[in-house]
Amino acid sequence: MMRKTLLLLAATVACAFSAQARKTYTLSSPEGRLQTTVAADDALTYAVTFDGRPVLDASPLSLTLDDGTTWGVDPRVAGVSRTSVDAVIPSPFYRADSLRERYNSLTLRMKDDWSVEFRAYDDGIAYRFVSRAKKPFNVVSEQAEYRFPADFEATVPYVARGNEGDFESQFFNSFENTYTTARLSALDPGRLMFLPLAVDAGDGVKVCITETDLENYPGLYLTNAGAAKNGLKGVFAPCPEKLEQGGHNNLQMLVRERKDHIAEINAPRTFPWRVAIVGTDTDLAASDLSFLLAAPSKIDDTSWIKPGKVAWEWWNDWNISDVDFRAGINTETYKYYIDFAAEKGIEYVILDEGWAVNKQADLMQVVPEIDLPEIVNYGQQKGVGIILWAGYWAFDRDLENVCKHYSEMGVKGFKVDFMDRDDQQMTAFNYRAAATAARYGLILDLHGTHKPAGLNRTWPNVLNFEGVHGLEQMKWLSLIHISEPT
């Protein structure tokens, strides 16, 4: 009898622990229209409803490490914390001087060295992993899936044609293309989609998927997860193993071999936010979540940062008429552009590709037709700042000296081009470049890079991103592309 009693007690305790392991946690937005339900069962999942209607079914999230453990499989919750925030944050050089940030958060602290944090804003749900591990480790893979209640229609940007082939060849791209609209089941499983992308959940409600706070971690691509799942699954570029200088005018570093993991983690850290913005088309356009979820500014005094328009000589191929000199990449032409900018109230003139010796990836070698100090001084007299174009590798290989040298000359900033990757090494470069430029009072315009993902909040000297299928493309594409969404 005693044995039966002990067995019954043990079974009761086991059931209690099992029920606890299967416990779900709900988190609602401040206004209550959005709700996420997080389940810590055999797998860690979350689902999202909007006004009580499912817009995202239970979707798994996990990180697999090089020691064989997987954060998110059989998670063991050690503690739960909740907070609510309603604050006003500064947002210089954004679309408003300040923003209201209001959200409710849920953090599940696991018995291992990690946590997962969820936030519910009125316009979206976001989550991120947090590592407390003090020893270095590698992330072999990340599971980021989005499973929808039905075969919804999606509007997505595939990696552009010309990068066809396996995913490895598609990891090298400029993140600019027109958008394709198709049912989730009809999306090409052999092609990567970059972010952001939108899924139409019906009744005027859209779900926009993106990420932010993307520092020192590979960017998220999505691909078709299979018709049975009505969803999308994440793909990440592995860390580069072997790089070779090449590409456009020898200004890029091309990945020839990759490692067997996507990220190398050396200290406790937070991981990028996975964001689902939910609402109408207007709500999506008005959302500030990418900015709000990023790390706060690391520049205390931003008074030196001056946004402005730029006169862009590359667009019309340096062609000007009715002048008494030969137009082109030379001092006289740039003085003409400076005069034009001063007359029209344009704050900057850019010296696009061609001012430095080509194919050398050396920004200290200026072509003989250019007297750069004279151009900079002339611009200062006219109240016009000078921005220099720089290929990524030429900029990165001598970053400190380049920034120091041209800052002392009076140059105001750089347009950095041809990154064309978003593996961990490249996203780390973006932050390193911004930090170095800030030390020398330089602004940055990043071209040929991934979507905006929080960098401009953390380093507000980054004034622009040019990763859209924009004006540049009109020089060589047929007019039919103008009617396609970009």
Language-model-detected regions and their locations in the chain:
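Residue-level detector of conserved catalytic or cofactor/ligand-binding positions
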Residues: 477-486
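Glycine-enriched loop-and-adjacent helix/strand subsegments that border the catalytic/binding cleft
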Residues: 249-263, 268-345
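Acidic/polar loop patches that form or flank catalytic/metal-binding clefts of enzymes
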Residues: 443-448, 471-477
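Substrate-binding cleft of carbohydrate-active enzyme catalytic domains
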Residues: 307-451
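N-terminal accessory beta-strand-rich subdomains and adjacent acidic, glycine-rich linkers
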Residues: 22-292
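Bacterial Sec-dependent N-terminal signal peptides
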Residues: 1-23
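Substrate-binding cleft/loops of secretory-pathway carbohydrate-active enzymes
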Residues: 405, 452-474
